[in-house]
A protein has these predicted regions:
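Bacterial N-terminal signal peptides that target proteins for export
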Residues: 4-16
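Beta-lactamase-like hydrolase cores
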Residues: 19-20, 24-65, 81-86, 120-129, ...
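Conserved serine DD-peptidase/penicillin-binding transpeptidase domain
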Residues: 32-34, 63, 79-308, 400, ...
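Short beta-strand scaffold segments in enzyme catalytic cores
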Residues: 44-47, 89-93, 365
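A short glycine/serine-rich beta->alpha loop
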Residues: 57-63, 207, 317-320
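N-terminal post-signal-peptidase region of extra-cytosolic proteins
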Residues: 58-59, 73, 112-119, 315, ...
Length: 405
């Protein structure tokens, strides 16, 4: 058994004992990242090898997990719906010939999906509509995601049951005017309006408010209908689908849950994570889905699945600084996620893990490849730290030279 990690940890006073030690000797400079983490007062680290704890540093201390919370959300979604699940959106035609789109929480309703919708409606015989109505009532009107700010950053986009293109608009502003930055996405009146004050360049605009997000969904659908030769007579309405309106089409997204989760984890998409978080709060009572309902569902799941107690899950993306998980709790989720390990982002082929970053928070959790197998780890740093430190720790655990990513 190799003793160098054990000696380092004894010198640092990080742990009293260790079940196993790292199996491969690493150069002294490669060990620096691990030593630094073990010396940090506000850092927790838990590594298993062969089903036993290999490194344990403050494993039961509640910490802010940041975006590693997305592993928990992904696991819950898979357990609830299965990897083959496809989200859907309903389309209704009212007696006054208004076409209504009812959002049911599909997080990946993008421009290309609307093209498929319009093509199907046209094939079914839709020739014109009096106007487009939008129904976003699945989510409560007062939904507020803890930790989400009102900034224009795309990761702060509002979470709505009816959302297109992740509630963002991609535009190019130049001296010639404004144009869409995406060939598949026509420029709508709202997009033009929001882009006017911007400096020259390409911009991803966060729609910021629920009303703007729902309006944009209606405008984009109307533009797609018109482009396909289906005239839209009136304007836009927002409300509930009128009683008696016939459902003429249910569109199932082309991406299954596997693809949705893989994208969420790779790009750390907060919109997708919190959309799933709200949907997971559906208890079948027919009431709008709220943040409070989603939080209660998450807490009940954590207690039933893992027996957690000293935890707090305020949102599904890890945006909230009020979230709390210990390294041991996060490792519980990581180990349960083992069958879906390849959905996690890859680091140099020897690490599959999810990062998390907030101000003064740097986290990393997933799997490192060691001795022909994949071993789980969770690292939670709740104090200022270099961005690359967590990656270097994972490299070190995997026996790879730091920085080769």
């Amino acid at each position: 058994m190799v003793n160098w990690v054990g000696k380092r940890m004894r010198r640092l006073g990080a742990i009293a004992s260790m079940a196993l030690t790292l199996a491969a000797v690493a150069p002294a400079d490669a060990a620096d990242a691990l030593s630094r983490v073990l010396a940090m007062p506000k850092a927790s680290l838990l590594v298993e090898e062969g089903g036993r704890e290999a490194i344990s540093r403050q494993p039961d201390r509640p910490m802010i997990p940041a975006s590693t919370m997305k592993i928990v959300t992904a696991l819950r979604a898979i357990q609830r719906w299965g990897l083959d699940h496809r989200f859907h959106t309903d389309f209704h035609l009212a007696d006054d010939n208004w076409l209504w789109i009812k959002g049911l929480g599909d997080p990946y309703l993008v421009s290309e999906e609307l093209d498929l919708v319009v093509a199907t409606l046209k094939r079914q015989g839709l020739r014109s509509v009096a106007g487009v109505g939008t129904d976003d009532s699945l989510f409560a009107a007062d939904v507020q995601i803890p930790g989400r700010s009102s900034s224009n950053n795309p990761y702060d986009a509002p979470v709505t049951a009816l959302a297109v293109n992740f509630n963002t608009i991609n535009v190019v502003r130049s001296r010639e005017g404004v144009r869409s930055a995406e060939p598949q996405t026509p420029l709508t009146p709202l997009a033009r309006q929001l882009a006017q004050p911007l400096a020259s360049g390409t911009h991803r605009i966060n729609l910021q408010e629920r009303e703007l997000a729902v309006r944009y969904a209606g405008e984009l659908l109307a533009a797609k209908l018109s482009a396909a030769g289906i005239p839209v007579g009136g304007g836009l309405r927002t409300g509930r689908v009128p009683a008696g309106a016939a459902r003429i089409y249910r569109h199932h997204g082309t991406r299954d849950l596997r693809a949705v989760i893989e994208s969420m984890l790779e790009y750390s998409n907060n919109f997708i994570a919190n959309d799933l978080f709200l949907l997971l709060g559906d208890d079948g009572d027919g009431q709008p889905l709220s943040t409070a309902k989603a939080q209660r569902a998450a807490d009940a799941w954590a207690r039933k699945t893992f027996g957690w107690r000293d935890h707090r899950i305020e949102d599904g993306a890890g945006l909230s600084p009020g979230n709390r998980l210990s390294a041991r709790q996060l490792l519980d989720a990581v180990k349960a996620f083992a069958p879906y390990r390849e959905l996690l982002p890859s680091q140099n082929g020897r690490v599959r893990a999810k990062t998390g970053t907030l101000s003064g928070v740097s986290t990393y959790a997933g799997f490192v490849q060691r001795n022909g197998g994949w071993e789980p780890f969770s690292l939670l740093i709740n104090q200022p730290a270099p961005h690359a430190l967590r990656l270097d720790v994972a490299d070190e655990l995997a026996g790879a030279p730091p920085g080769l990513r």
